[in-house]
């Protein structure tokens, strides 16, 4: 029997959906029958993804900075309640600057990464999950990182934020489960997106060196986690909750 991922009739919001993994998730959800709000801080990116999915009613762009509670409130007014929330928006390490050991950082180095990688998960979830509970159905998936599952140099702040997001989601699952709402995480490793994709394009040796850390001997592609996210958001995943599912090429092997 073929596995059917069915999100028909459901409305989803994907934060950070304007490129990379977020865009791939939007495509997977629409393919599974959902209609999707594509969120991004850059309106043109969100619009491009929505247009690539055929536009309304299949996909609509919604611009918002998800580190701002006020802009999240406005986004919630625009989208209305949703059935599916994918917390995907995030930034690497301590932002987009140079990698630093924790003892060499200053608090201002942490703030952007913590606001987006943890704070946005809390604020966006708070804005949307209550309506799921009231309606008796919902799916929440947060994209996290193996940096929150194992200790690595230069990852103290990023790892702390992602571990915090995981802890939040596990507790959320316990709270909202009786109302028919599930909450799960998908943990990624090095993905060929954004800054890393640009670096690998300039110097393929960077990708080769990183890939040696993975049993699959390659970096992740944006499409790798998308099907799993769609599955977790589907009707058939009603007994899958409170878990962290790795899509990491075997980078972290653990019970």
Where are these regions (language model features)?
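Short C-terminal tail/terminal secondary-structure segment
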Residues: 1-5, 96-99, 150, 230, ...
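Alpha-helical segment proximal to the catalytic Tyr-Lys
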Residues: 130, 174-175, 238
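Catalytic Tyr-X3-Lys loop
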Residues: 91, 103-122, 137, 141, ...
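Canonical Rossmann dinucleotide-binding motif of NAD(H)/NADP(H)-dependent dehydrogenases/reductases
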Residues: 3-37
């Amino acid at each position: 029997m073929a596995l059917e991922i069915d999100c028909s009739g459901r409305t989803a919001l994907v934060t950070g959906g304007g490129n990379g993994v977020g865009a791939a998730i939007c495509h997977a959800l629409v393919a599974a029958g959902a209609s999707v709000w594509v969120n991004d801080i850059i309106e043109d990116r969100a619009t491009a993804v929505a247009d690539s999915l055929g536009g309304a009613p299949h996909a609509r762009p919604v611009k918002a900075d998800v580190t701002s509670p006020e802009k999240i409130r406005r986004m919630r007014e625009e989208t209305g309640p949703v059935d599916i929330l994918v917390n995907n928006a995030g930034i690497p390490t301590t932002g987009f600057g140079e990698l630093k050991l924790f003892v060499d950082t200053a608090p201002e180095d942490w703030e952007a990464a913590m606001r987006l990688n943890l704070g946005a998960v809390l604020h966006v979830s708070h804005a949307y999950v209550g309506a799921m509970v009231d309606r008796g159905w919902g799916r929440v998936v947060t994209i996290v990182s193996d940096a929150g599952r194992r200790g690595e140099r230069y990852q103290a702040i990023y790892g702390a934020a992602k571990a915090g997001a995981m802890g939040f989601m596990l507790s959320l699952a316990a709270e909202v489960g009786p109302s028919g709402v599930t909450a799960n995480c998908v943990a990624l490793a090095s993905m060929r997106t954004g800054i890393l994709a640009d670096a690998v394009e300039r110097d393929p040796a960077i990708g080769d060196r990183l890939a040696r850390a993975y049993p699959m001997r390659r970096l992740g592609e944006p499409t790798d986690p998308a099907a799993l996210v769609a599955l977790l958001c589907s009707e058939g995943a009603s007994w899958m909750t409170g878990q962290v599912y790795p899509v990491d090429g075997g980078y972290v092997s653990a019970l």
